[in-house]
Amino acid sequence: MSKYIKLFETHSQYEAYTADTASFITPNVSFCMDVPNEVHYNPLLPPHPYVEIGGHKWATMNIGASSPTDIGLYFAWGETETKESYTWDNYKFGGNASGGQSKYNNTDGKRTLDLEDDVAHLTLGGNWRIPTQNEFAALLQSATTTWTSNYMDSGVAGLVITDKTDNTKVLFLPAGGFYEYGIHNVGTIGYYWYSSPTVENYPAFAYALNFQNGSILEPGPKRFEGFPIRPILGE
């Protein structure tokens, strides 16, 4: 882990930053250096790759993925950790299909995820977050969509999203299916969570993008189900 030191001379300031092993020679002046008992630092993270389509910057990979064709990790809506199974019994906000969730319900009136419950934001930092329903809609309006069973000879099926005005701008959403007691429908169905809850008065459900073959739907799956996450970079 690299460490950074600022050297302060009487009337000016010298700074040196590097991620590599290096040595520095300071000007021939006297200086003093205050060293605190504790040093707090934020790691320098490389920028996450993205493609800009329809005025929004979309990550090229899912949360937990190592490549665009990797499905990555599955998360229940509003949860920030993976699990061995996804059910109402172990859902973070509790409840069941009839309601009773402790947050994002008809009482608190919250209509989108708080950042503390947004795994994209917590994983990537900065302005990264889970997209809203409207942002996914804008993406699809600005692009053409094509189902493929073998994206770029990878053997992975999913949805290819190509910018209507620049066909070099392409997103691929792997068809990762869904996760309950196990993973189902990989390669045939894709689900991706929005940050928006569903229709008012139905707090047990949340909006998601759903695609299979040539069809694109917008169902309201149960919030406990595990889906992949495709982040967006906010302003």
Where are these regions (language model features)?
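Extracellular/surface-exposed low-complexity repeats and stalk/linker segments enriched in Gly/Pro
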Residues: M1-V29, M33-N37, G177-Y181
